[in-house]
């Protein structure tokens, strides 16, 4: 009987902890903000995709994702950034 009580207790605690973890992640879902911009050259051939940060962020940014999965925060007003976005959009169309 003791192993059954222990199993019930472990199941209850595990369920409660998973619910707590899920609730904590839910508060920031979809909210990724850039604190600073990348100032180096943008490696066009290594870019996979891009997205714009949320309006809730204090700094507007374009985030490029490389083929290695690295995120690069970029200034949306920068000419190189605009060219990189156009490049990726042209790849999507073809």
UniProtKB/Swiss-Prot annotation:
Subcellular location: Secreted
Tissue and organ expression note: Constitutively expressed in thymus. Detected at lower levels in the lung, colon and small intestine. Expressed in stimulated peripheral blood mononuclear cells, but not in resting cells.
Stored SMART domains: SCY
Entries under InterPro entries matching the protein: Chemokine_b/g/d, Chemokine_CC_CS, Chemokine_IL8-like_dom, Interleukin_8-like_sf
This protein's UniProt keywords: Chemotaxis, Cytokine, Disulfide bond, Inflammatory response, Secreted, Signal
Top-level taxonomic group: Eukaryota
GO function terms (MF aspect): chemokine activity; signaling receptor binding
Conditions for induction: In monocytes, up-regulated by IL4 and by GM-CSF/CSF2 in an IRF4-dependent manner (at protein level).
GO biological process: cell-cell signaling; chemotaxis; immune response; inflammatory response
Record Pfam families: IL8 (PF00048)
Signal peptide: 1-23
A cellular component annotation (GO) from this entry: extracellular space
First-listed, main subcellular location of the protein, grouped into a coarse class: secreted
Positions of disulphide bridges: 33-57, 34-73
Functional note: Chemokine, which displays chemotactic activity for T lymphocytes, preferentially Th2 cells, but not monocytes or granulocytes. Therefore plays an important role in a wide range of inflammatory and immunological processes. Acts by binding to CCR4 at T-cell surface. Mediates GM-CSF/CSF2-driven pain and inflammation. In the brain, required to maintain the typical, highly branched morphology of hippocampal microglia under homeostatic conditions.
Family assignment from sequence similarity: Belongs to the intercrine beta (chemokine CC) family.
Protein known as: C-C motif chemokine 17
Species per Swiss-Prot/TrEMBL record: Homo sapiens
Source lineage: Eukaryota, Metazoa, Chordata, Craniata, Vertebrata
């Amino acid at each position: 009987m003791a192993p059954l009580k222990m199993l019930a207790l472990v199941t209850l605690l595990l369920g409660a902890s998973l619910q707590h973890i899920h609730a904590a992640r839910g508060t920031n879902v979809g909210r990724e903000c850039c604190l600073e911009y990348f100032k180096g050259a943008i490696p066009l051939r290594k870019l996979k995709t891009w997205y714009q940060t949320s309006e809730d962020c204090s700094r507007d940014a374009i985030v490029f994702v490389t083929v290695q999965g690295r995120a690069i925060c970029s200034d949306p007003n920068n000419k190189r950034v605009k060219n990189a976005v156009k490049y990726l959009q042209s790849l999507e169309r073809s």
